[in-house]
Amino acid sequence: MSTLKEKLITQIASERTIPNSKVTVVGVGQVGMACAISILGKRLGDELALVDVWEDKLKGEMMDLQHGSLFLQTHKIVADKDYAVTANSKIVVVTAGVRQQEGESRLNLVQRNVNVFKFIIPQIIKYSPDCTILVVSNPVDILTYVTWKLSGLPKHRVIGSGCNLDSARFRYLMSEKLGIHPSSCHGWILGEHGDSSVAVWSGVNVAGVSLQELNPAMGTDRDSEKWKEVHKQVVESAYEVIKLKGYTNWAIGLSVADLLETMMKNLCRVHPVSTMVKGMYGIENEVFLSLPCVLSASGLTSVINQKLKDDEVAQLRSSADTLWSIQKDLKDL
């Protein structure tokens, strides 16, 4: 006897079983779910997989998103603690890890998170050997290095979200000061995502007009307009948000979706993301820092050779030294 479905539908061909543009988010905490909803909102994949060790929350988040399927363009949303659910992912976003506490620097998080990655990364590679991994967990630059070492992937397929959000915060704060939309305020934060980041004042511009040419003291202690405070606000903003609401999630989720859009759509846009910088700007160690990078469907395909002033290069090297001082002591990688 025919079922209702068989009476309703005449099948012509078998459905494709392997997704074209599957995205996995590892970790369904505040950041992971902000990434997930931002990715869904941009219609970036034909399948979204969620994975975590917290089974009840994982199932609840999956069901909550599935119930909103009518309003989304990603028709398949799956979740499981078993990494088999992530198979055939094009991009894997890693947000898992222990949460940053109020007043805790990102670098203090490192050893607690390394052990988590020793389990996660091999599982990702087992089921999606051809994927690109985007690391979001903090401290993101060191954990991107850890991911690169554990995964065995080429460096262009291991990317850290890096200073994409720092630069967005910088441009927002510029826009508030100038009364111009952030998209028209151009500036770059490079180096470590966090306390030793570098503001490239020499490149800050609006419509091609160098702001440092208009105000040569910009970014220095001599500046009466105190532009240096803008970078200080960028560095402190995450701590401020954590103090107020307990965590950050929405801005990083939107930032991650921005990066995925560039890669999934092969847009070849330039983003300040974390990549292996050994041999660049006189940096001698294998550290990951943010530089302006071209992202495409292949991952991170090239780095823009930004002309930096001597003091900016010195700050970048100092940022590298800060990371290496911790990274060199990591074991079992």
From Swiss-Prot:
GO cellular component labels: cytoplasm
Biological pathway: Fermentation; pyruvate fermentation to lactate; (S)-lactate from pyruvate: step 1/1
An example Gene Ontology biological process: lactate metabolic process
Binding site for NAD(+): 29-57, 99, 138
Enzyme Commission (EC) number: 1.1.1.27
Active-site residues, as the UniProt record annotates them: 193
SUPFAM superfamilies reported in the protein's UniProt record: LDH C-terminal domain-like, NAD(P)-binding Rossmann-fold domains
Signal peptide: none
Binding, substrate: 106, 138, 169, 248
Top-level division of the source organism's lineage: Eukaryota
Major site of localization recorded for this protein: cytoplasm
InterPro entries: L-lactate/malate_DH, L-lactate_DH, L-lactate_DH_AS, Lactate/malate_DH_C, Lactate/malate_DH_N, Lactate_DH/Glyco_Ohase_4_C, NAD(P)-bd_dom_sf
Pfam family, one: Ldh_1_N
Coiled coil: none
Top-rank EC class of the record's enzyme: oxidoreductase
Substrates-to-products reaction catalysed: (S)-lactate + NAD(+) = pyruvate + NADH + H(+)
Localization (cell): Cytoplasm
Family membership: Belongs to the LDH/MDH superfamily. LDH family.
Subunit structure: Homotetramer.
Name of this protein: L-lactate dehydrogenase B chain
Organism name: Alligator mississippiensis
Origin organism lineage: Eukaryota, Metazoa, Chordata, Craniata, Vertebrata
